[in-house]
Amino acid sequence: MARLVLELLAAALLLRVAATLRISAFNIRTFGDSKMSNQTVAGFIVSILVQYDITLVQEVRDADLSSVKKLVSQLNSASSYPYSFLSSIPLGRNSYKEQYVFIYRSDIVSVLESYYYDDGCESCGTDIFSREPFIVKFSSPTTQLDEFVIVPLHAEPSSAPAEINALTDVYTDVINKWETNNIFFMGDFNADCSYVTAEQWPSIRLRSLSSCEWLIPDSADTTVTSTDCAYDRIVACGSALRQAVEYGSATVNNFQETLRIQNKDALAISDHFPVEVTLKAR
């Protein structure tokens, strides 16, 4: 009888762990065919992404999605769970373009809706974002909050304060469009060091929005290089979403330490570490 109770407790614990949702944002520097053709680097990327249920991948340079498809195929081979992806179109003001790609476990989450934030006339030079957010609403039946929105941003370093500030307008736009403020803002905001200084933070509206909480602090280091900068951030908005976040789960994944690799090998993967957060099980 005691053994049965222990087995049931173990099964319940496994179910609870499986029902939480681990989400990350990862700028994989210049992700494309060249990176995926390196078997060692590709293997490391798979070993990082397989830890997550949703990953926002940034700096994807893969217009035909061949490297993304290869990555997801390798993820599906490495995991006992199925992964799918949703990609934006290539975004950028000139010939240099990047994609936002969401890679997610399709057995526990699904995409409900998506749209591109309209930030003004690109050809006129009056748009705000270098890479406008590709906004996605997810369904997550296993977590306390069963629907939430992710707004991605890879900010242009030279205009990072203005782009982060404009996320408040995106916040309002999502509320008007989908009638929810349960929103994650995440990505490489370039939100520290010389790109966003201490003097600039007071004028950034998202920083002081009472409904939002900055989960990755200014003291964090999200860089693989010798710099110490909190470029990559996760911001949780909406009371239901903030309450659904597992306490203490927001962190930086230092894969150089967890994979026990040298700095040069870590830099072959990216110059950024992923940032992550976990949603509580239902």
UniProtKB/Swiss-Prot annotation:
Divalent metal cations. Prefers Ca(2+) or Mg(2+). Its EC number is 3.1.21.1. The lineage of its organism: Eukaryota, Metazoa, Chordata, Craniata, Vertebrata. PROSITE patterns: DNASE_I_1, DNASE_I_2. It is found in: Secreted; Zymogen granule; Nucleus envelope. It comes from the Eukaryota. It catalyses: Endonucleolytic cleavage to 5'-phosphodinucleotide and 5'-phosphooligonucleotide end-products. Disulfide bonds join 121-124, 193-229. This is Deoxyribonuclease-1. The active site is at 98, 154. SMART domains: DNaseIc (SM00476). Its cofactor is Ca(2+); Mg(2+). Serum endocuclease secreted into body fluids by a wide variety of exocrine and endocrine organs. Expressed by non-hematopoietic tissues and preferentially cleaves protein-free DNA. Among other functions, seems to be involved in cell death by apoptosis. Binds specifically to G-actin and blocks actin polymerization. N-glycosylated. The gene is DNASE1.
